Amino acid sequence: VFSEEQLTRKQPGEKGIIMVQLENEYIYFDMESEKKEEFLRVLSDACIRNGIDVPLFTCVTPEVRGSHDPVISQLFDMDNQYVWWNMHEAKSRIEKLKAEQPNAPAFVCELQGGWFSTVGGRLSEDSYLDGRHARGMALMAMAGGSTGLNYYMFFGGTHFAGWGARRMTTTYDYGAPLKENGGVGEKYAAVKGIGEVVDKFGGLLVRSRPVRFDVQGADNLTIGIRRAADGTLFVFLLNRDKKQ
């Protein structure tokens, strides 16, 4: 259905599909690792047989990381950053991902900045998450060495009637920077600012290396320092003190 839309089938300068996801969050499936690995091999084979030749990836599936299986080792795993975590965990999770698969891209598949609306429950617009949260999550992922960020969601949408998951409303605004109705606010400004930094320094950032350092008297700070090949230093700070 989409094999001809892959970037590998396009002319230089044309847009196309750059990667294909095999599954979603197998870490939460109550299934033995051997069964997960078997299913991953089947999915991978199905893609290859149907002409998919762009990179194949998984989403939070530990079985892929560091695998020596001849099929699974050709995949790479991505991480998710969930909204209910402390923001500084985004840094340590990316560091863990890079350690477990050092020769693969360090991507965040879902850099979440909101949550869905539920019938009889909280709506996306009632979420406590604001521009500071969106900025902090992105910066901490970058501090950990992330080489790719995918906002989930960047823009809100609307389900066709009855097409949503169980207990979900028709609206899928998700508290996104670009809202379901097209509106923007401080979260959009925060994400736009991150995009401007990446646009200007992305080439240096993705090839930067972590810098070891020692900090005293800053218990409420999460700090990350990265050095680019030309000596440029990128310093990331997150104040975890709720009162300041």
Outline where the language-model segments fall.
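Carbohydrate-binding surfaces of carbohydrate-active enzymes
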Residues: 1-9, 13-22, 28, 33-53, ...
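Short alpha-helical segments and helix-capping/turn motifs at coil-helix boundaries
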Residues: 3-4, 41-43, 61-64, 85-95, ...
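Structural motif
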Residues: 24, 60, 80-82, 237-240
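Active-site-proximal helices and loops of the catalytic beta/alpha 8
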Residues: 32-94, 187
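Glycoside hydrolase catalytic-domain groove-lining segments
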Residues: 66-120, 137-138, 178
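Alpha-helix boundary/interfacial micro-motifs
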Residues: 68-70, 97, 127, 162, ...
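Short, hinge-like loop/turn segments at secondary-structure boundaries
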Residues: 73-77, 125-126, 167-168
